[in-house]
């Protein structure tokens, strides 16, 4: 009875799907045929969306029935589900087309007429996509069969070795499907990059169809050499990316199948065995938790005082609770305090690593390698040392060692070895309180030494101020140290740039002043004892002049004092006696040199045949020898990557995507290589340069708009720039004064006068390399560059001047001066209107 009701429900859903698909297809056909009525098209799209929603709900019902073992006929469920998914894909395509902007890059590419090769490439790509989808559908159908076999094997009555054999066979089929999908995906990607000939794919099309249609036939024989002739591994980057994607997909499929098989194996066990496995798992979890807890407990060692040893994690908390207490929590010996205060952070980290690698039970107090030093700061800014036992890594980084303290330790290690030994002998018989005070004094000296080695700051707000809480003091200290470092770097950079631009070295006037060092020391140690500061300053006065010069660091911060001492007053008059030569050309000289080089390169057609690297070398040498390019030795890193050009790229022009740039450069280079026969043959025949130039232009006129724009801005030689500009002008493109926008009028002018014109325009923007469409756009003539006849300039350079009428040239120049720029454009506009 229940089975009959379920079958009736399935039939009812099938009927609804058939009706919904019929309605959907009728709406879809009307939508595709509707091209002139946008409102009707939008209404049909909303109707399609409503029908797809209904079909999606029915598809969810079918998916639930597919996973249920009550329904035997799963093939019909799969067919109806696939028909609904096809309708969903159709609607997705309709929705994507409706969301595309009218003049986006995709729409403009669609509007262009495709050549036969592009159409063939698109057809082959669609064919490969269909084959990949068909193999995916077959993969899903086999996965359904595998799930069925797994359900049968769960029960002892239906379990058999035949099911396992079928399952393994289906998995082998799925592995072959994935391999063929990977090869087709590689071919698809290579076709998109124009690295694979569509005809090669056509040659193996029959073999691919045979595999897709007949791979499960009994007499099927697979040919694994189908894709050998396509050379799919030519692009290693694409091959690696596709292989990585399919490897992750296979791993995901294997994990899913392993999980299903493990559930099947567990279900075969008896309840008693399952309970036994659960008990063993619980015991293992408890044992692991116990081991983790034991490893986190530090081993306490013998201390020199009755007070307990403070752990690493609680050391800073104890310091915050008792600000007035001694900074050393474990009363260590003064000798150990002095030794640990001059250790570097690296040594303490090295001592920590072996202790972490050993087990907690093997850590004993007698092993000296297991002891490490934890350096921290008290609220008044003095560092202290605590001897700790090995423990696990804390959640908070162990220690708050500042970079100034670490730097001063390395300096003081060399100049205070003798004073440290005397301090050890004098303080060995003192009480613990005296020892703590001595350690405090040594740490204060360390901070003063750090201040002496730090560039002076003119901002008084960066000095350390006392605070009530330890946390706020630590934060203020960290902020001051970071600000000091940033200010020092900024000051060093400014001084370095001043040095590069000045005629005399600035280190002569930047001699260090002991008074400034004294001010830095007193500013940093406002919170420390006064007697400690005085004692350190007295020790500093007793030092020899050589040591004082070693410790003094000028505020310039870039060069050492040795360089300053090497300078002698005798060398300065020699520099003054040298004749002063101008480093840079004036603006008029620069323009004259630029025009001269431009005329020379525009008339040299053989530069088009040179590789880009040779062109760049020639241009940079010419610019450097003519003093147009700066001869200063100092250059920024980004300047080293710039290509030398006679005309720089405008400020608002950004480079396109690397793939588009590579494609444009490749097309341009192919055209340049094809000019070899034209240029060399014309020179042998001694043809006129104007005829050679016309042949060159004719060769470049086949290029697309994007390549012309790219090479107008990023080509190396002036001749290439002139060629691109000439062809763009022939196609009625007009460029703005700043060179960041180009305008192309569509149709006739709607309004014009001497100042502006109004019409429909295509605007090419160089900041993002996109074309936008503007209706009724007002174009001011003052915003455009004046029109330049590049062909006449080239010919004036190359043609012999004996046959040129000088009077006509003068008349032309007089006309250009008399007629304004707006009138010239208006005249050209009228001519264009008449031609339209």
Swiss-Prot record:
Protein name: General negative regulator of transcription subunit 3
Domain of life: Eukaryota
Glycyl lysine isopeptide (Lys-Gly) (interchain with G-Cter in ubiquitin) crosslink location in chain: 535
Classification of source organism: Eukaryota, Fungi, Dikarya, Ascomycota, Saccharomycotina
GO cellular component: CCR4-NOT core complex; cytoplasm; nucleus; P-body
Entry's family note: Belongs to the CNOT2/3/5 family.
Modified residues (Phosphothreonine): 571
Low complexity compositional bias, start-end: 418-446
Assembly behavior: Forms a NOT protein complex that comprises NOT1, NOT2, NOT3, NOT4 and NOT5. Subunit of the 1.0 MDa CCR4-NOT core complex that contains CCR4, CAF1, NOT1, NOT2, NOT3, NOT4, NOT5, CAF40 and CAF130. The core complex probably is part of a less characterized 1.9 MDa CCR4-NOT complex.
Coarse class of the protein's main subcellular location: cytoplasm
Compositionally biased tracts (Acidic residues): 559-578
An individual GO BP term: deadenylation-dependent decapping of nuclear-transcribed mRNA
Keyword Transferase: no
Listed InterPro entries: CCR4-NOT_su2/3/5_C_sf, CCR4-NOT_su3/5, Not2/3/5, NOT2/3/5_C, Not_N
Record's compositionally biased regions (Polar residues): 252-267, 341-386, 447-468, 522-531
Role played: Acts as a component of the CCR4-NOT core complex, which in the nucleus seems to be a general transcription factor, and in the cytoplasm the major mRNA deadenylase involved in mRNA turnover. The NOT protein subcomplex negatively regulates the basal and activated transcription of many genes. Preferentially affects TC-type TATA element-dependent transcription. Could directly or indirectly inhibit component(s) of the general transcription machinery.
Residue numbers carrying Phosphoserine: 303, 307, 322, 446, 450, 565, 569, 657
Skewed-composition ranges (Basic and acidic residues): 268-283
Disordered: region residues: 252-284, 296-391, 410-471, 513-532, 537-583
Coiled-coil blocks: 36-68, 119-195, 255-292, 803-831
Keywords from the named record: Activator, Coiled coil, Cytoplasm, Isopeptide bond, Nucleus, Phosphoprotein, Repressor, Transcription, Transcription regulation, Ubl conjugation
Note: Present with 2490 molecules/cell in log phase SD medium.
Cell location: Cytoplasm; Nucleus
Species assigned in the record: Saccharomyces cerevisiae (strain ATCC 204508 / S288c)
């Amino acid at each position: 009875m229940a089975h009959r009701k379920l079958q009736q429900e399935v039939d009812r859903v099938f009927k609804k799907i058939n009706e919904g698909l019929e309605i959907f297809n009728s709406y879809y056909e009307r939508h595709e045929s509707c091209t002139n009525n946008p409102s009707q098209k939008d209404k049909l799209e909303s109707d399609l969306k409503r029908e797809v929603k209904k079909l999606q709900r029915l598809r969810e019902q079918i998916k639930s029935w597919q996973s249920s073992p009550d329904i035997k006929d799963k093939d019909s469920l799969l067919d109806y589900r696939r028909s609904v998914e096809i309708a969903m894909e159709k609607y997705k395509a309709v929705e994507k087309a409706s969301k595309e902007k009218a003049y986006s890059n995709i729409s403009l590419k669609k509007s262009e007429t495709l050549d036969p090769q592009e159409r063939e490439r698109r057809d082959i790509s669609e064919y490969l996509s269909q084959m990949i989808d068909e193999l995916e559908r077959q993969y899903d159908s086999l996965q359904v069969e595998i799930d069925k076999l797994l359900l049968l094997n769960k029960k002892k009555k239906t379990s058999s070795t035949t099911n396992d054999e079928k399952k393994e066979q289906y998995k082998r089929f799925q592995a072959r499907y994935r391999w063929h999908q990977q090869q087709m995906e590689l071919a698809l990607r290579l076709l998109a990059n124009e690295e694979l000939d569509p005809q090669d794919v056509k040659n193996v099309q029959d073999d691919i169809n045979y595999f897709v249609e007949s791979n499960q036939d009994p007499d099927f024989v697979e040919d694994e050499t189908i894709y050998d002739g396509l050379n799919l591994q030519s692009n290693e980057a694409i091959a690696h990316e596709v292989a990585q994607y399919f490897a992750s997909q296979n791993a995901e499929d294997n994990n899913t199948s392993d999980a299903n098989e493990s559930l099947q194996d567990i279900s075969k066990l008896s309840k008693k065995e399952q309970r036994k496995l659960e008990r063993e798992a619980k015991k293992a979890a408890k044992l692991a938790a116990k081991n983790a807890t034991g490893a986190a407990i530090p081993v306490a060692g013998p201390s020199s005082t009755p007070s307990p040893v403070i752990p690493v994690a609680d050391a800073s908390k104890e310091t915050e609770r008792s600000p007035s207490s001694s900074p050393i929590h474990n009363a260590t010996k003064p000798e150990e305090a002095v030794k640990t205060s001059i250790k570097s952070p690296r040594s303490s980290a090295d001592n920590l690593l072996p202790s972490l690698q050993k087990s907690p039970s093997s850590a004993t107090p007698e092993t000296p390698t297991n002891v490490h030093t934890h350096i921290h700061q008290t609220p008044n800014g003095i560092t202290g040392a605590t001897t700790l036992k090995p423990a696990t890594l804390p959640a908070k980084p162990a220690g708050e060692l500042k970079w100034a303290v670490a730097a001063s330790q390395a300096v003081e290690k060399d100049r205070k070895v003798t004073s440290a030994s005397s301090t050890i002998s004098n303080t060995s018989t003192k009480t613990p309180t005296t020892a703590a005070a001595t350690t405090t004094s040594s740490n204060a000296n360390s901070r003063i030494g750090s201040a002496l080695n730090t560039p002076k700051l003119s901002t008084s707000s960066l000095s350390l101020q006392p605070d009530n809480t330890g946390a706020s003091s630590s934060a203020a200290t960290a902020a001051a140290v970071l600000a000091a470092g940033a200010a020092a770097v900024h000051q060093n950079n400014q001084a370095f740039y001043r040095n590069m631009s000045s005629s005399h070295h600035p280190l002569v006037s930047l001699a260090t002043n002991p008074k400034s060092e004294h001010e830095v020391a007193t500013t940093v140690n406002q919170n420390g004892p006064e007697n400690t500061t005085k004692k350190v300053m007295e020790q500093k006065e007793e030092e020899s002049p050589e040591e004082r010069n070693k410790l003094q660091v000028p505020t310039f911060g870039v060069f050492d004092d040795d360089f300053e001492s090497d300078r002698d007053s005798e060398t300065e008059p020699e520099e003054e006696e040298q004749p002063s030569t101008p480093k840079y050309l004036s603006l008029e000289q620069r323009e004259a040199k630029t025009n001269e080089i431009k005329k020379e390169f525009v008339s040299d057609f053989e530069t088009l045949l040179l590789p880009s690297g040779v062109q760049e070398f020639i241009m940079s040498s010419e610019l450097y020898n003519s003093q147009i390019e700066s001869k200063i030795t100092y250059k920024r890193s980004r300047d080293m990557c710039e290509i030398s050009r006679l005309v720089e790229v405008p400020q608002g022009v950004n480079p396109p995507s690397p793939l588009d740039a590579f494609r444009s450069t490749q097309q341009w280079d192919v055209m340049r290589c094809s000019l070899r026969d034209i240029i060399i043959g014309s020179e042998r025949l001694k043809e006129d340069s104007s005829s050679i130039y016309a042949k060159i232009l004719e060769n470049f006129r086949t290029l697309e708009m994007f390549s012309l724009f790219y090479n107008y801005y990023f080509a190396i030689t002036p001749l290439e720039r002139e060629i691109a500009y000439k062809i763009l002008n022939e196609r009625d493109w007009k460029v703005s004064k700043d060179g960041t926008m180009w305008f192309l009028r569509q149709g006739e002018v709607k309004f014009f006068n001497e100042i502006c014109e109004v019409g429909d325009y295509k605007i090419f923007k160089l900041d993002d390399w996109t074309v936008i469409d503007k209706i009724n756009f007002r174009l001011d003539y003052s915003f455009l560059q004046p029109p330049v006849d590049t062909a006449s300039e080239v010919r004036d350079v190359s043609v012999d001047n004996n046959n040129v009428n000088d009077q006509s040239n003068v008349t032309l120049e007089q006309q250009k001066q008399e007629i304004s720029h707006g009138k010239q454009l208006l005249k050209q506009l009228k001519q264009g209107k008449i031609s339209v």
